[in-house]
């Protein structure tokens, strides 16, 4: 396997047949684990966002409580102002000028209230428009979220398919390397066989030339014999009749001797052939031993049996060779004895005239031998032609295999280059995916933090609304107190008019005390209303002028002044409490503003990260397109490799190991595909869970919107109450209301900003949903591609079965050829043994049957007599 980095290199069978589809199914199963880790990070980010929203909701509830407390305090302030108004009504008769001034102030407050109402209505309208915009933005964010989810699913599917294709391509590259190595080995073996055939051819040609030389020598001997025949024809006529029988016997003996010589020569040739066959068998044995060592795991039993057969043949051949050597020694001894007899006979023939018939018969025998030698020569030529044909066929096959090997080497180099390129691209894609996923995790985390901040701000808004309500209640209480004070002042003024005459002396002391108390009140009011000092100073001057005018009529109002002092002390205490409460509310609002600034900065950072994620997603899409193009090229290469495999059918007998390896690789590919399918199913389940979480978050957003609407309704009711209170409030209360309204506006602005940020987060969520949907679509496409690859694997399995069948057939054919060769060698050996036995039997038979002696004697008178004694033994 190639880089069982699940580099799933599809090489001629998805692990050997994807033509170098180096899509790292690397083995890159690490990519799937990375995706799972990133999905876990996304779920963690969702949980953190939920926590942010919960915190914002809590802060919103706290703000609502604060607004309620403020409204209650305002109501209390209105009650206290009503008591003050009642006191002022009692004193209206004495303080006409003061009433006019109060009416002027009331008109001014009404005008300010009218302006405030208009502003408030405009603000409410703006808030309604903003709410509509927020709703639209929420819908857009939902859509974008769905798109983002689809994109996430598509990316996951693309990653899985890319890894699978890479693994298959790596496998195919390794398979092709293995096949090329085996083909090189086979080509080396073929070259060895070609060299052996050429050596056999040269040897046979040498033997042929030697045989031709021998034929020429025999022809020369024939010519010499014919010449001798012509010379001795006249001399042999007299002795011809006597020596016919003896010459026939001698001729038969010589024929036997010559046949023995020919047989000896044939036996020598056969021994040479057998020695060569022995060498070939030894070579085959060495080859078989090498093959047994290399293919021991698969063909150990067959090779062992073959080795045993070869060893038995070797033993037989050794025995036969030893027997032949012994027979040769015996024949050589016989030949030496025959040669001695022949030399003796030739000397006798030279002496005797009767040798002429022997020469004639010898010539006839030589002609027969020449005919036999010519027949042998023709047979040898036929054998040579057959051997040359076989050699040419072997050379053609070797050339074709060499060309195929060159093609395979070229294809292998291309596939290796493509594998390296695919590995580099796969690394780049994995790095880009890792960066994208890290960016996605950061974005989810930031979105979660933003949602938490939104929840916290909503809780703060609720607390501020509660504080606002409390302030309204306090304001109402203060207004009631002011009304009571005005009523008491009116009563005091009426008493002053009745008691002017009686209490002129006490007026100065009362005036001093009253002035001191008014100064204390003014000081406390200045502390409570820092922004309204100018108006309080103006009122103070007016009250001082009125008091100077009424100094003569305030002697009788000592008791009323004491009561007023008590009420003023109470009011001062209430004002101090209100001031402290206002300071706390202001501090909380400042904290809310700071938190809003932090959330704004976070939103900006999230937007920048989203843009980076979009860029990364575009890069991932580009990488996906490149991977698809590479996949198509790899499919084309797979087709080319299949054609190459068809062309390599001639070498079926030696490719069984390749097909077995291919089958194992196919099984591994099936297993890896199953594992990848299980992982895809797990990822789909996790994506479904993330979808459910997103749906829950959307439901929570809907709930938040309902809460916002309810809060807006509460704000409207509070505004209505404020308007009612403003109609009856005094200048101080109206100023307090104006302050509170300004603070409420600030809070509303902050809430609007938070809504805007929330809308942006919803947009981001919609984009993520869209991306997730796209990723799901990609996952489906990858499943389809996996099915196509499975079909390709099935087709390649069928091809492997066909190849195996062909391999078995070729193996059977080769085994039959080997058997026929062995049988032919055995037959030839048996024939040689039979011939040797026949020669021995003939020699022994001739020796036993025919024994002759030639003697010569010199007769007086110069005549020479030759006596031939012949002994024949016949066995009946």
Curated annotation (Swiss-Prot):
It is found in: Cytoplasm, Myofibril. Pfam families: Myosin_tail_1. It comes from the Eukaryota. Residues 1-28, 856-876 are annotated as: Nonhelical region. One of its GO terms (cellular component) is myofibril. Residues 29-855 form a coiled coil. Keywords: Coiled coil, Cytoplasm, Motor protein, Muscle protein, Myosin, Thick filament. Gene3D superfamilies: 1.20.5.340, 1.20.5.370, Vasodilator-stimulated phosphoprotein. Transmembrane segments: none annotated. Its main location: cytoplasm. Homodimer. Paramyosin is a major structural component of many thick filaments isolated from invertebrate muscles. Belongs to the paramyosin family. This is Paramyosin.
